[in-house]
Regions:
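Short, thiol/selenol-centered motifs that function as redox-active sites or metal-ligating centers
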Residues: 12-18
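Short, well-ordered, aromatic-rich surface patches in folded extracellular/luminal domains
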Residues: 1-12, 37-48, 52-53, 59-118
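Short amphipathic alpha-helical segments, especially helix-boundary/capping motifs
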Residues: 26, 53-54
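Short, flexible N-terminal segments of the mature chain
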Residues: 19-38
Length: 118
């Protein structure tokens, strides 16, 4: 039995939050600059995304990435993943990132047709 897939990312700083989320029936919710839209997410893109997640080693990322300095503002982000096999990961950070974080953002942009900047 396949588990419900979860692909959810949100990030924010001083600007309104940006977020993407996989919904049921190959749809995705994109919220950029307080504008929400529903987009089509073809199955082949979802499968390709999971391949890239594996290649990038995201399953091995730590659960938390926080700056060693106390920062009152700054960029905060959260990633929630669960693939069709049931593998799951919840990761969050505040002004600290894994080394290939930009690659994750690139893959999310490909999957959802967005232009999240980092």
């Amino acid at each position: 039995m396949n588990k419900k897939e979860v692909i959810s990312y949100s990030g924010f700083s001083m600007m309104p939050p940006e977020s993407v989320e996989l919904l049921e029936n190959n749809k995705g919710r994109v919220v950029i600059n307080e504008n929400e839209k529903i987009v089509d997410v073809p199955d082949y893109k979802i499968l390709s995304f999971w391949d890239r997640i594996e290649q990038l080693g995201i399953w091995k990322w730590k659960k938390k990435y926080n700056s060693k300095y106390e920062i009152l503002d700054g960029y905060q982000w959260q990633l929630k993943l669960r693939n069709r096999k049931g593998e799951a990961k919840h990761i969050e950070g505040h002004e600290s990132y894994p080394k290939n974080f930009k690659d994750l953002i690139k893959e999310l942009n490909i999957l959802f047709g967005t232009k999240i900047e980092f």
